[in-house]
């Protein structure tokens, strides 16, 4: 999907007085916060990005010189508010795009999934303003239609952007996501420490987040029970491999096992599930989910991917079964269809080979 008519305004004109450091240029990992924030929008194909600067404008402009971002200065940043900087950015983009994301520069970890779903919702409906939330708490970015932009630019500034939003009687939509980044910023040193911690772990969702993801996608209790059983068997396989000095990432295995059927009920559920999870930032988990139905080969040294595949083939419903039992019903049902039967037996033989490699069975 192309997003040529969508823009982003990143407000970076403040003094960061509560932080006691300059937030936009503080590093998290290998990039500054403002660079990571910008990258979120570039990663989905948004090219019209404006950063509104004020304090230390020269430093921000130098840092962003190679980022394909337009910078505009709020020369009165010492005497004005964040809303004034926002309006400077909105005026710059108002005539060239149909929607505008607005965000502070210290909101670096919003998921691609969140951004794309917000755009999809505004494209398919007549909402003027869409705001995301996580666990009932509103956050950023906020997506504005061109109509909302015009209304906001007429606002007198009372209570800032929230004051303008409050005036919108119809056309406001709040969307809930399983995306902690929505409500994370760096107003204080403690907030910043939490961002640093989150960055270290954000590629693999916690068990708590996995459960929330299952609930978000309305996974049935039956599928959940199966997934938990697969997760349990996956851990047993990991322990078996550890005895042979093959040390795998247990949290990656657990998350992938719990989420492997997140799209169960959809056509090509392994592809759909991996697509969702990839957009949520869980790339490694997505690869395992994609391959849990069918493996291309068995590597010399087994990985997390093979563990989840085998565990899934050892569980029927929520019960541990033999691989023969796991496939017998489908083999019988498709016994007159050589193509499908061949595919089933290929998966079965792969599972048997893996079982022999792990347990010697």
Predicted regions and their residues:
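N-terminal nucleotide-binding beta1-loop-alpha1 segment
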Residues: 1-21
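Conserved alpha/beta core of the MobA/IspD/sugar-nucleotide pyrophosphorylase nucleotidyltransferase superfamily
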Residues: 2-4, 156-208
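Short catalytic helix/loop segments, enriched in acidic residues and glycine
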Residues: 24-38
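Conserved beta-loop-beta/alpha segment of the NTase-like Rossmann-fold superfamily
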Residues: 78-151
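Charged phosphate-binding loop/patch that engages nucleotide di/tri-phosphates or the phosphate backbone
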Residues: 182-185, 197, 337-361
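Acidic/His-rich, divalent-metal-binding segments that scaffold phosphate/diphosphate chemistry
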Residues: 194-269, 279, 319
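Divalent metal-dependent catalytic cores for phosphoryl transfer on phosphate-bearing substrates
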Residues: 242-334
């Amino acid at each position: 999907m192309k997003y040529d008519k969508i823009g982003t305004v990143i407000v970076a004109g403040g003094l960061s007085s509560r932080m006691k450091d300059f937030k936009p240029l503080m590093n998290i990992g290998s990039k500054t916060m403002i660079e990571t924030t910008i990258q979120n929008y570039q990663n989905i194909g948004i090219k019209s990005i404006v950063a509104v600067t004020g304090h230390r404008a020269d430093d921000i402009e130098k840092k962003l010189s190679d980022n394909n971002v337009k910078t505009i200065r709020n020369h009165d940043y010492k005497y004005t508010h964040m809303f004034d900087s926002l309006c400077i950015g909105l005026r710059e983009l108002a005539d060239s795009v149909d929607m505008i994301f607005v965000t502070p520069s210290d909101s670096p970890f919003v998921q691609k999934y969140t951004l794309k779903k917000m755009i999809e919702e505004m494209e398919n409906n007549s909402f003027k303003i869409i705001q995301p939330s996580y666990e009932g708490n509103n956050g950023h970015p906020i997506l504005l239609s061109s109509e909302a932009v015009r209304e906001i630019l007429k606002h007198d500034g009372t209570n800032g952007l929230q004051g303008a939003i409050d005036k919108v009687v119809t056309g406001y939509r709040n969307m809930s996501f399983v995306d902690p980044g929505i409500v994370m910023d760096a107003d204080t040193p403690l907030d910043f420490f939490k961002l640093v911690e989150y960055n270290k772990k954000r590629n693999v969702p916690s068990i708590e987040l996995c459960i929330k993801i299952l609930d978000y996608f309305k996974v049935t209790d039956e599928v959940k029970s199966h997934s938990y059983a697969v997760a349990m068997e996956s851990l047993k396989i990991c322990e078996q491999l550890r005895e042979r000095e093959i040390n795998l990432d247990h949290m990656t295995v657990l998350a992938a096992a719990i989420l492997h059927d997140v799209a169960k009920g959809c056509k090509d559920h392994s592809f759909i599930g991996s697509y969702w999870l990839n957009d949520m930032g869980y790339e490694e988990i997505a690869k395992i989910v994609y391959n849990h139905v069918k493996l291309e080969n068995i590597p010399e040294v087994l990985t997390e991917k093979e563990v989840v595949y085998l565990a899934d083939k050892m569980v029927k419903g929520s019960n541990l079964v033999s691989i023969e039992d796991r496939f017998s019903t489908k083999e019988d049902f498709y016994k007159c269809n050589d193509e499908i039967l061949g595919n089933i037996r290929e998966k079965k033989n792969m599972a048997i080979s893996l079982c022999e490699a792990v347990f010697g069975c």
